Amino acid sequence: MRDDQVLVSGLIAACREIIAAHADHLSELDRAIGDGDHGTNMRRGCEAVYADRDRFSQMPLAQAIEEIGLTLVLTIGGASGPLYGTLLMEIGRRLAAGGEADFSAALTGAVEAVARRGRAQRGEKTLLDVLYPVQDEVIRRHALSAIAERAETSATLTVGMKALRGRASFLGERSIGHMDPGARSCALLTSAICHYLKEHRAA
């Protein structure tokens, strides 16, 4: 089995595991400021990707990332599906076009695409409040452990933010004091990816 096959299959399993373990928590966060189904939706998307992992692992890495993104768009639903899907599809396309050496450039372009898709920016209590800090860490080529830590810290910081996008924005000031569920799921996935990559590199 090629290294990228192992990588794709391993990352899919790691992401599925962490979302399954925290799905109820994510839905609990979402009940406070949204529809209450974020954990259920994320788990459905991750299970769909996991079910098709053998097909994805046979693809070149960039293509696999793009195809996984498409699967998430079709299966997660709600606002999160298009955002996570856009992120991965853009990363995959940019890696395919520019080569896999510069992941930071691909990530930067993909995060901007997510911002455009969601019509959001940093500080508005969305998953972008994790994606932008993670992007900063990747650009600076910080260690994987530092990237994971920054993601977790950034998700926590959304507790003090007022929601300006999505259903949570209808709550106005009452959205303050609650962690954004999209930011939390993004931090969880970032942490799972970083920990897997760290272990994979050491193997």
Name each region found by the language model.
Residues 1-203:
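N-terminal loops that bind phosphate or other acidic moieties
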